[in-house]
């Protein structure tokens, strides 16, 4: 599965529009700087390295980000409709977390996270067209996302921190204390982490279906 060069350009333009209509002031300036720095990489990056995971093709990353934003806004509206606690959240909080939940998959300031699979056999037999770049320092995708945002002086609220931290749910061991609280005083006070995790899971499942049914 792949998308056209025209679709890649259209997705990038759509992401830029979301940025320009969501943020303002210093935050907008720095988020634009981040996207300008990584533009070529972001436009062509895959969302995963394995075909049957999701969006393992050029342009897959940006397409996934847009899908997660769409799903996150739908979950946000549904939570509000069902009288869940969302009074501590804004649309900007939700979009911010959806937009940057996988930022770590871009790599570091100079190096891609994914590289073209050097092993032809793995690419063909295992369906892995991409491999992880061994030149990078190892970090979880979430931790690298925080690090990259810090490089561009992009601060976040506590809610936004939780949204990014919890995005991968229990697929990431570091999230266990957030989902298995263990004590009443540790109970999560915001639903942002659940909204983003459900949005990421739903978008990923939808993308996987496009591959499975194509």
Q: What spans do the regions from the language model cover?
A:
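Short intrinsically disordered terminal tails
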Residues: 1, 213-214
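Acidic/His-rich, divalent-metal-binding segments that scaffold phosphate/diphosphate chemistry
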Residues: 1-123
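Divalent metal-dependent catalytic cores for phosphoryl transfer on phosphate-bearing substrates
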Residues: 55-57, 63, 84-212
């Amino acid at each position: 599965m792949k998308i056209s060069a025209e679709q890649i350009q259209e997705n990038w333009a759509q992401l830029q529009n979301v940025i320009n209509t969501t943020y303002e002031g210093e935050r907008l300036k720095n988020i634009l700087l981040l996207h300008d720095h990584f533009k070529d990489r972001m436009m062509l990056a895959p969302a995963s390295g394995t075909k049957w995971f999701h969006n393992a093709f050029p342009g897959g990353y940006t397409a996934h980000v847009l899908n997660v934003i769409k799903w996150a806004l739908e979950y946000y509206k549904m939570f509000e409709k069902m009288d869940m606690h969302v009074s501590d959240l804004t649309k900007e909080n939700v979009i911010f977390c959806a937009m940057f939940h996988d930022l770590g998959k871009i790599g570091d300031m100079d190096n891609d996270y994914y590289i073209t699979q050097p092993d032809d056999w793995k690419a063909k037999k295992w369906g892995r067209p991409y491999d992880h770049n061994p030149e990078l320092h190892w970090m979880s995708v979430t931790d690298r996302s925080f690090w990259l945002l810090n490089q561009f002086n992009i601060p976040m609220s506590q809610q936004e921190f939780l949204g990014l931290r919890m995005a991968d749910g229990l697929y990431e061991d570091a999230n266990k204390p957030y989902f298995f609280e263990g004590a009443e005083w540790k109970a999560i006070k915001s639903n942002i982490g659940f909204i983003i995790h459900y949005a990421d899971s739903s978008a990923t499942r939808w993308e996987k279906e496009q591959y499975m049914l194509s």
